Amino acid sequence: MLKLFSAFRKDKIWDFDGGIHPPEMKTQSNGTPLRQVPLAPRFVIPLKQHIGAEGELCVSVGDRVLRGQALTRGRGRMLPVHAPTSGTVIAIAPHSTAHPSALAELSVIIDADGEDRWIEREGWSDYRAHSREALIERIHQYGVAGLGGAGFPTGVKLQGGGDKITTLIINAAECEPYITADDRLMQDCAAQIVEGIRILAHILQPREVLIGIEDNKPQAISMLRAVLADAHDISLRVIPTKYPSGGAKQLTQILTGKQVPHGGRSSDIGVLMQNVGTAYAVKRAVVDGEPITERVVTLTGEAVSRPGNVWARLGTPVRHLLNDAGFCPSADQMVIMGGPLMGFTLPWLDVPVVKITNCLLAPSVTEMGAPQEEKSCIRCSACADACPADLLPQQLYWFSKGQQHDKATAHHIADCIECGACAWVCPSNIPLVQYFRQEKAEINAIRLEEKRAAEAKARFEARQARLEREKAARLARHKSAAVQPAAKDQDAIAAALARVKEKQAQATQPVVIQAGSLPDNSAVIEAREARKAQARAKQAAHPVADSAISGGAPRKAAVEAAIARAKARKQEQQAGSEPAEPVDPRKAAVEAAIARAKARKQEQQAGSEPAEPVDPRKAAVEAAIARAKARKQEQQAGSEPAEPADPRKAAVAAAIARVQAKKAAQQQVVNED
């Protein structure tokens, strides 16, 4: 009995609140096997096909590439993208991508050469011989991302799980109407999917591995059971069909009975989830050595004549796939990427297929029905009953319309999975999911701006702190420089002063050069002394002539010369206090000539007259008296106010002096004759 209850608990499944049962519409496309689509002539590969930043380009325009060649480098959460076929890179430019607003993303545009040549592939058939880190790195570098719709990098997800994961869940529910990509993949490639699941289990080492699949896929269930017949490490759980049981939080609750907390992740409760398409891509990356260059896409809707599931190369234009399926557009044709509840309408058909593209729905006008007018909310609470996340959609609707971001956040709008169940049941035809998407985008923009402001504030505060530190260090340096020198500094200063005094004392002492030292000037000194002795002897031999020469006339001339020098000095002082007078060189020359003539005349007179005895003491006294008078006149000239000089008067005086000099010279010539 105990074993029976244990077995019952082992296969037990739970339920979640809310949910709806829309028409499935899956039989249009799940009855035909997977098929290949002819290569498009041109491929557009967006660099960003996942959650996170785009990778770094490693190709340029004009490069030839092979299928599987990396177009970008993957570092951190930057997932690389690879060439879907061989060809030539003709452009690297923005191009519209798979987005509700058809936003432009930087893309690599390749012209296919039709050869479809692969790069050299190196598979790891014995993946167990490699470490966990090596497997995760290979999965990341081969561009594997979540193919269920989220597009989160698989390698990053496996790395973040670490040792906390106790349950690995493989999501095979595929609950949205029309989509059968996973269903057909499980029917055609069940063995490869199970091998990929085992690689994931080898990396994570969980206690249990669960596959959750809805009961509306009988062929896929039978194929998986056949592959898992001898396997005891993987459990297949068939769950009731209910939308949105394929949501990550909803499927976790169905299979484990655990609820992911608000704002948390499934890894917080020891659960990690991967899609069956992701498991297949992991097998091809690790075992076959093939990067992800294609995926299964459902082509369905009444506007296509050949619905089914195809292997679509990444970067293939949507128009090319629909034309291969027999697309017959109407006047106002609508094409939806994704399902009717969570998908979005494409503005044009040149958008490329990316890693998260799982379905292209081309419905007819009668299939989708006429658009209905949006009406006011009647507070019926039907949306709250259908919400699988236990939210209050009608309150979130009012908060979103009123721009009440704080209240919307407090009511856990971030937990909305945008499944569209509330909009499906709304009797007023309110597009609630559109309001919620817009509100979440605005909240994210506000948070991003707040983050930038906080970072800018932190940078400013760090700069201010750095400036304060530099200022304090500067003041400390100035303060230390102003401190009195220490005792050892005083000793150094005293020694320097002593050296200076010693040098000064040496400079004042007479320099005595010993004979024989360098330079030796003794011979020159002796010659000079000999000349002086000869001059004295000669002077002693002619005392009469010397006394005659040094008679009264020369003494008188010396006195006059002293007086002239005093006058000249006085005039210089007056010139220093008065404005400078123009100097006449001719006048100075005339005056000098007159003085020489007078001196010559006096000498002649002295030669004709008998020489009077000269008293040297008397001559010295007279010269001293003359110098004293000259000095007194200089002092008086310095104390008296300077008279203004008249240049015309000076010129007249100079002319008179020249005339007198000529007359004196003529008179001297007459006297000599």
From Swiss-Prot:
Keyword terms, alphabetized: 4Fe-4S, Cell inner membrane, Cell membrane, Electron transport, Iron, Iron-sulfur, Membrane, Metal-binding, Repeat, Translocase, Transport
Classification via PROSITE patterns: 4FE4S_FER_1, 4FE4S_FER_2
Gene Ontology BP annotations: electron transport chain
Entry note: cofactor: Binds 2 [4Fe-4S] clusters per subunit.
EC number: 7.-.-.-
Pfam families reported in the protein's UniProt record: Complex1_51K, Fer4_7, RnfC_N, SLBB
GO MF annotation list: 4 iron, 4 sulfur cluster binding; electron transfer activity; metal ion binding
Family under the similarity heading: Belongs to the 4Fe4S bacterial-type ferredoxin family. RnfC subfamily.
Subunit-level organization: The complex is composed of six subunits: RsxA, RsxB, RsxC, RsxD, RsxE and RsxG.
Descriptive protein name: Ion-translocating oxidoreductase complex subunit C
Gene: rsxC
